[in-house]
Design a protein with these regions (language model features):
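Secretory-pathway/membrane protein signature
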Residues: 1-441
Length: 441
């Protein structure tokens, strides 16, 4: 029921895929090692008023209020969006970073992974693509459940949307004319096989070296040091996490590969022993996964980040703006930097009144609205207070060579506030990495 116009690809085809996969497993007589739940969530497009996080509400309610006990027990949530459309010559899977290695092995080395036929001529790319917030899997991911979704939104650069989103998305043109049977057949087979692979392997394959790589990529050592963060302690915690994660992954791979060998040989006794060993590793890894998302996953509104990236990014942008203003160049400041502050929320400050922005801010950060944030609960960033300067620069766009003392003062004050935030978040992340490494040992 939750769709725009026909909603054929988005998301009736996904509903059809889930039901077809359930029927195929049932008709084939497949006996899973674990419970496999087929779940269709409502309120995916919209489900709340006066909230900046008003989509994927049904999924958030399911994992947080209806079945919170699934966290720590669920091996994976496999989600689907627009699954019967050929977006390009390749396809991908978006996921939690900890699942990148498992998805790469499944697509490229696992003997029973289906290959595309009649679609996706360049195959399944497995460079590692972090899930975004535009689908139900993010609600599960943020809650601590390993999650995936077929690559439906962004091209492989993970910045540019597919043309579908310009031509058809949320319009009456998302209709049965877009259907590609070969794509649908492939997605049913591929993700059905992935579900069975995850179900059958004794140890859930989560690779926390990818989490360490994510944290490393998010570091700007110069800005962090400038803010007073203990960069050396942060890097030491990263090293400890990488070591613990590498050792844990080696255990998981050893158990799972041995299980595959025993299965091919029909060695039931070895399989039973490996499953027992894998069960303990799975429990340990799922707890570590939950902890990692609780402490190391943040948002800049709808963009997933490492928490310290928000103040780090703001400091960098504010410094660039100040440099432009000291050169008397407001046009460059506006065109290249000012509108991008606060994850482009400052663009709205340029074009809407302070009263409108106050409502938007209240929806995000108002004390009385914190129980209305859904998948943004406890992980949204703190906005930098630069609206007045943003608005002023937009008005003074053509004032080349002018005096921007007042605007510079606003950005300088913001930098000092953001430095304190950055130092605090770096400390919290250092402690979280240390705790995560301990969970993996």
């Amino acid at each position: 029921y939750d769709m725009h116009f026909f909603g054929f690809q988005d998301d009736n085809c996904a509903v059809g895929l889930v039901l077809a996969m359930a029927k195929a497993m049932k008709d084939s007589g497949y006996q899973p090692e674990n419970d496999i739940v087929f779940c269709l969530h409502g309120a995916e497009e919209w489900g709340a008023s006066y909230s900046q996080f008003d989509w994927t509400v049904g999924a958030w309610e399911m994992i947080n209020h209806v079945h919170p006990e699934w966290v720590g027990k669920t091996l994976a949530f496999i989600n689907f969006e627009l699954p019967a459309y050929e977006f390009d010559t390749y396809t991908t899977t978006y996921s939690a970073p900890e699942m990148f290695a498992m998805l790469d092995y499944f697509a490229n080395d696992y003997a029973y992974a289906p290959k595309p036929e009649g679609c996706f001529a360049d195959g399944v790319l497995t460079e590692g693509y972090q899930t975004y917030t535009y689908s139900d899997d993010f609600s599960y991911y943020a809650a601590g459940v390993p999650s995936t979704v077929n690559g439906f939104l962004l091209q492989k650069d993970m910045e540019t949307v597919f043309p579908f989103y310009i031509d058809y998305y949320h319009t009456q043109y998302d209709n049965p004319d877009t259907y590609n049977e070969a794509v649908m057949r492939f997605n049913i087979a591929y993700y059905g096989a992935l579900a069975m692979y995850i179900d059958q392997m004794p140890a859930t394959d989560l690779d926390f070296t990818a989490q360490a790589a994510r944290l490393t990529a998010a570091m700007d050592e110069n800005v962090m040091a400038q803010a007073g963060a203990d960069v050396e302690a942060y890097k030491a915690a990263l090293t400890a996490l990488e070591e613990a994660a590498t050792a844990m992954r080696a255990k998981v791979v050893e158990v799972n590969r041995a299980y595959e060998t025993a299965r091919e040989a029909g060695d039931d006794a070895a399989m039973a022993q490996l499953r027992e060993t894998g069960r303990a590793l799975t429990s340990q890894n799922l707890e570590a996964f939950r902890y990692a998302q609780k402490h190391l996953l943040g948002l800049m509104y709808e963009r997933p980040i490492v928490p310290h990236e928000a103040p780090q990014e703001t400091i960098t942008l504010c410094e660039a703006i100040i440099e432009c203003l000291e050169d008397g160049d407001p046009a460059t400041a506006v065109d290249e930097y000012a509108w991008t502050v606060n994850n482009v929320l400052e663009w709205y400050a340029m074009y809407f009144s302070p009263e409108v922005i106050a409502v938007q801010d209240d929806m995000n950060w108002g004390a009385d609205n914190q129980d209305n944030l859904y998948w943004g609960t406890d992980i949204n960033f703190d906005k930098a207070d630069v609206d007045a300067a943003t608005r002023s620069l937009y008005v003074r766009y053509d004032d080349k060579g002018g005096d921007f003392t007042e605007e510079i003062a606003i950005y300088e004050k913001a930098i000092e506030v953001e430095k304190a935030k950055l130092a605090a978040k770096a400390t919290a992340e250092t402690e979280a990495m240390q705790a995560l490494a301990a969970l993996l040992k």
